[in-house]
């Protein structure tokens, strides 16, 4: 489908209160294209309100959420809660827009659901394409504008009355659908590759658990008790400190001055770039001067990275970085050059091990792990033939994950370049 799309650059614009738009487009207020309504929170003291079948969405459910549609959040409510608390069930296709810090997270209701009071939801009128509105709100221009018009200095909030008066560029429903179709093509590809990666990751981690935690393939072998691990392990397997077989390094202080970000092309990974899956998806960028002045190390592609300090430490995220990079000092790195056939064994090991380690973190204001806390942890080392066999089984899975991730990054770059040009009419979709 993508290769059959025909675009053209728009050449005829008209001046409006929101700037230049194509001469055949309109400007409409949100209140003219849909109903704006909020949600609420049932009393948490009444157990009968919670654990039902009705999805209840909060802004937290949209944090780091990259899909267009959402069907449910962390919690559900009951019919009793809806009736007694005057909650509204929003229909499929409703635009869910967060109105409190953070302002501007957006998704589309995949099915009927409810939200808390941290949303200003838009129920589009007939003929209005939900996906077009979704992509419009995803632009940096709209996101920043919504924050600018939100009242409150300490706790900014986008009021419903304010949102209703927001003016937006409004193409015909047919063109709205064309724009949404082109952009959702990229998002569909991205979602499919993400789902592939989730399945591949699950297979690899299950295999690791089966072999090196449950020891299922080795049940018939002789087992011996190991003091360091406080459990029985197959005879002939070694137990070593993690620091005895590899080096864990800390990232560098983050540059602050603008001079270090001019003509920046070197990926700089921060805590915010860590993800729940295998691969880092994005980064900030610094330049060669920052690399030199801060004595930063440039790590190799496919190195392993994880958090060692910060508020989100207990999420215990461990990632592989599919490109060369440097990292902030809140992160720890194991360079891929020292991993060889242990690469994916160590990655899987850390996925399980880090969860245990973070429960003993120090620091009340800012939880942190020392590098020594990690390097002094005892781990099991299987015989080389077993390690090589495991590597041969999971390497194709991880290589596919990494290749998928590289494709996702390219797809996102193309989508993000097209997004503002399409929704603001600079680029027109002629044919699909």
UniProtKB/Swiss-Prot annotation:
It comes from Methanocaldococcus jannaschii (strain ATCC 43067 / DSM 2661 / JAL-1 / JCM 10045 / NBRC 100440). Type I restriction and modification enzymes are complex, multifunctional systems which require ATP, S-adenosyl methionine and Mg(2+) as cofactors and, in addition to their endonucleolytic and methylase activities, are potent DNA-dependent ATPases. Pfam families: Methylase_S. The specificity (S) subunit of a type I restriction enzyme; this subunit dictates DNA sequence specificity. In the presence of the R subunit the complex can also act as an endonuclease, binding to the same target sequence but cutting the DNA some distance from this site. Whether the DNA is cut or modified depends on the methylation state of the target sequence. When the target site is unmodified, the DNA is cut. The gene is hsdS. GO terms for biological process: DNA restriction-modification system. This is Type I restriction enzyme MjaIX specificity subunit. The keyword DNA-binding applies. Keywords: DNA-binding, Plasmid, Restriction system. Belongs to the type-I restriction system S methylase family. Signal peptide: none annotated. The type I restriction/modification system is composed of three polypeptides R, M and S. PANTHER family: TYPE I RESTRICTION ENZYME MJAVIII SPECIFICITY SUBUNIT (PTHR30408:SF12), TYPE-1 RESTRICTION ENZYME ECOKI SPECIFICITY PROTEIN (PTHR30408). The keyword DNA-binding applies. Contains two DNA recognition domains, each specifying recognition of one of the two defined components of the target sequence. GO terms for molecular function: DNA binding.
């Amino acid at each position: 489908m993508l290769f059959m799309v025909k675009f053209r650059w728009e050449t005829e614009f008209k001046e409006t209160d929101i700037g230049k738009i194509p001469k055949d487009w309109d400007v409409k207020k949100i209140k003219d294209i849909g109903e704006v309504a909020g949600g609420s929170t049932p009393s948490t003291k009444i157990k009968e309100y919670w654990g039902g079948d009705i999805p209840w969405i909060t802004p937290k459910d949209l944090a780091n959420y990259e899909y267009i549609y959402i069907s449910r959040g962390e919690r559900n409510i009951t019919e009793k809660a809806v009736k007694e608390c005057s909650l509204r069930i929003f229909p499929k296709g409703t635009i869910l827009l967060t109105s409190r810090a953070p302002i501007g997270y957006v998704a589309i209701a995949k099915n009927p659901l409810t939200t808390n009071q941290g949303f200003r939801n838009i129920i589009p009128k007939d003929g209005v394409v939900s996906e077009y509105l979704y992509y419009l709100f995803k632009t940096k221009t709209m996101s920043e504008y919504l924050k600018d018009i939100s009242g409150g200095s300490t706790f900014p909030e986008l009021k419903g009355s304010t949102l209703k008066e927001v003016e937006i560029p409004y193409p015909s429903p047919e063109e709205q659908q064309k724009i949404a179709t082109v952009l959702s093509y990229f998002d569909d590809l991205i979602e499919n590759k993400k789902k592939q990666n989730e399945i591949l990751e699950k297979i690899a981690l299950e295999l690791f658990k089966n072999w090196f935690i449950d020891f299922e393939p080795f049940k018939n072998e002789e087992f011996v008790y190991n003091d360091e691990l406080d459990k029985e392990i197959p005879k002939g397997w070694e137990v070593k400190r993690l620091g005895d077989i590899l080096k864990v390094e800390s990232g560098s202080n983050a540059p602050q001055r603008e001079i270090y970000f001019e003509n920046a092309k070197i990926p700089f990974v921060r805590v915010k770039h860590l993800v729940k899956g295998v691969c880092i998806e994005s980064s900030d960028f610094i330049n060669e001067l920052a690399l030199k002045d801060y004595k930063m190390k440039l790590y190799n592609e496919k190195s392993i990275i994880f958090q060692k300090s910060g508020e989100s430490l207990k999420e215990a995220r461990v990632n592989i970085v599919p490109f060369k990079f440097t990292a902030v000092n809140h992160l720890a790195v194991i360079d891929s050059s020292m991993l060889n056939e242990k690469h994916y064994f160590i990655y899987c090991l850390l996925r399980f091990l880090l969860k245990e380690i973070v429960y003993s973190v120090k620091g009340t204001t800012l939880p942190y792990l020392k590098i020594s806390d990690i390097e002094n942890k005892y781990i099991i080392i299987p015989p080389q033939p077993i390690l090589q066999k495991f590597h041969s089984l999971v390497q194709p899975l991880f290589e596919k994950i990494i290749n998928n991730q590289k494709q996702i990054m390219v797809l996102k770059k193309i989508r993000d370049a097209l997004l503002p040009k399409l929704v603001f009419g600079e680029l027109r979709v002629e044919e699909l």
